[in-house]
Design a protein with these regions (language model features):
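Helix-to-loop junction immediately C-terminal to a conserved catalytic motif
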Residues: 58
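Conserved ABC transporter NBD signature motif
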Residues: 66-77
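Non-catalytic connector elements of ABC transporters
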Residues: 249, 260-356
Length: 356
């Protein structure tokens, strides 16, 4: 991650942004900033407002009110809306949208303004970008001669060609099959990072955001619930809904015993407490916090469990265990010889999360 290399001044600042479609509000008081060189993922389910937010930043949708600043320049505000073509942003959508009558070279040249790329400076820039995105050998091909992944690489190259301040990408990998999606995603993100560019991705793919983002903004019903690093959002989210959205979870009613411990059906569990004063709430645990083995890390709790079901999945084994009448599924990379009905110790690692 390149956060230590970034300058403190934000590249993009969004302040109190709202958007209505007729009477329906689709963006609610959105505020966040993006630093130079940072890659942000807007993560949420379909219809949550993330694409509308991206289009508002690009200038394709006009917000109802609020402000958008790029560097120290206002691009949207009260009685002011800078045209899209003057914002100096790159935009990549799901299926690339290349010009069918232009070859790869001229599609990229179009990103520089005239679609020709004939002068030496433009030729050098186009060749650099084609090398960076791995499409140099495709320069003379037309879009119908390209695979879906190649088309997306060309779309990214075209967006990068004018060296934009920021690139916006709306679900750029969703139209590709799974194997190709993984390959193209990795190549495109590597190209973005090598170019030193800043980017905002729209995605509904949680694993994609966790793996590749510098920061993730959780978008739900037109609001940003939380924006933070992937690790913080997974292990220390501010809200229960965010915690559940970020990964598989075990949620149980619980009561605080003291500031650092809660009692639930499993037993007494050390917790990170997100409640200021309330004693009753819920505790959230991740399945991977449970193990049948001692590790170098001291466990935070120890339970007695009984195996109810075993599912072998190759490199991992899923095991259903009953603890104090409550059944959970855990996954172990290496499992000893186990049988249904076995009684054995179950170790909990890391603290649970308590929410009132």
């Amino acid at each position: 991650m390149r956060l230590n290399k970034m300058i403190n001044n934000p590249l993009l600042t969004v302040k109190n942004l709202n958007k209505f479609f007729n009477e329906q509000q689709v963006l609610h008081d959105i505020s966040f900033s993006l630093r130079r060189g940072e890659i942000l993922f807007l993560l949420g389910s379909s219809g949550c407002g993330k694409t509308t937010l991206l289009r508002a930043i690009a200038g394709f949708e006009q917000p109802s009110n609020g402000e958008i600043w790029l560097k120290e320049r206002l691009i949207f505000g009260e009685n002011f809306n800078l045209p899209t073509q003057q914002r100096h942003l790159g935009y990549v959508v799901q299926e690339g949208v290349l010009f069918p009558h232009l070859n790869v070279y001229r599609n990229i040249a179009y990103g520089l303004g005239n679609g020709k790329g004939k002068n030496s400076e433009e030729k050098t820039r186009i060749e650099q970008i084609m090398q960076l995105t791995g499409i140099f050998e495709l320069a003379d091909r037309f879009p119908h001669q390209l695979s879906g992944g190649q088309q997306q690489r060309v779309a990214l190259a075209r967006a990068l060609a004018p060296n934009p301040e920021l690139i916006l990408l709306d679900e750029p990998f969703s139209a590709l099959d799974e194997h190709l999606r993984q390959q193209i995603r990795q190549e495109m993100l590597q190209a973005l990072r090598q170019s030193g560019g800043s980017a905002i991705f729209v995605t509904h793919d949680r694993d994609e955001a966790l793996r590749y983002a510098d920061k993730i903004a959780i978008v739900q019903q037109g609001k940003i619930l939380q924006i933070d690093t992937p690790r913080t959002l997974y292990w220390s989210p501010n809200h229960l809904e965010t915690a559940k959205f970020m990964g598989e979870s075990i949620v149980l009613p619980a009561n605080l015993i003291d500031e650092n411990n809660a009692q639930c059906q499993l037993g007494n569990i050390p917790v990170k407490n997100n409640s200021i004063s309330q004693k009753q709430g819920k505790i959230l645990l991740r399945p991977e916090q449970f193990s049948l083995f001692k590790t170098s890390e001291n466990p935070t709790a120890l339970f007695n469990g009984q195996i109810k079901q075993i599912e072998f999945k190759g490199k991992i084994t899923s095991i259903q265990i009953e603890i104090n009448g409550y059944t959970i599924w855990i996954e172990n990379v290496i499992s000893p010889d186990l049988s249904i009905g076995d009684n054995l110790p179950v170790y909990l690692h890391k603290k649970g999360l308590f929410y009132a």
